[in-house]
């Protein structure tokens, strides 16, 4: 098959972007200049990355890294949470959860709407990990702010244990979560591993 020069150029560009993100992730213990720029660029909604865009896809498919505890006391962290909350609550593209990679930040941070709590508040979970999944998986519909125009049927546990770095105490905290809220946690945790619900779906359909 004849080599396409346009394809070769795009492939080389993609490799450069992957190398750039790998270098950024090695910093780990502090905010990178790129992260600070994205978070400080405005006070309102953040752009939600789309898997259909090649550059966005590189970010979305990367494995996110953990925060150092000291980072949670920074103005940069607080601003990121504020802007992520505004973004997931945007009336035009409202969601029930969002992960930091979806707004261009490859850190282990998710916001989840707690339908299992009074008032159904959004709460943030840095360094989130799913520890245990109990019982049979149940099939249910899912969509994603980063996957436009599609929905799918995905099997998830309705009873899980999660661990996260508590922003108030700066200590690891373990919590049991059940029901639909457990599904949201699993969906958002997948983003931190560079995975989409479409990778696990039994079937996909257009909205």
List the predicted regions and their residue ranges.
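Positively charged n-region of N-terminal signal peptides that target proteins for export
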Residues: 2-3, 14-16
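Positively charged
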Residues: 28-207
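Bacterial N-terminal signal peptides
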Residues: 19-28
């Amino acid at each position: 098959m004849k080599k396409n020069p346009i394809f070769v150029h795009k492939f080389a560009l993609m490799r450069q972007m992957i190398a750039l993100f790998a270098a950024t992730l090695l910093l780990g213990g502090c905010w990178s200049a790129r992260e600070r720029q994205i978070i400080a660029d405005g006070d309102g909604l953040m752009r939600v990355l789309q898997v259909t865009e090649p550059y966005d896809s590189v970010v979305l498919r990367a494995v996110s890294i953990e925060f150092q505890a000291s980072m949670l006391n920074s103005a940069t962290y607080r601003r990121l949470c504020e802007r992520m909350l505004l973004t997931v609550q945007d009336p035009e593209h409202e969601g029930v959860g969002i992960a930091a990679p979806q707004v261009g930040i490859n850190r282990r941070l998710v916001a989840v709407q707690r339908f299992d709590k009074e008032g159904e508040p959004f709460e943030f979970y840095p360094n989130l990990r799913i520890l245990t999944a109990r019982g049979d998986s149940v099939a249910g519909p899912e969509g994603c702010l980063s996957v436009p125009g599609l929905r799918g049927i995905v099997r998830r546990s309705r009873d899980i244990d999660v661990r996260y770095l508590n922003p108030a105490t700066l200590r690891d905290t373990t919590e049991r979560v059940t029901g639909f809220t457990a599904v949201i946690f699993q969906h958002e945790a997948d983003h931190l591993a560079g995975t989409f619900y479409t990778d696990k779906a039994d079937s996909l359909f257009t909205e």
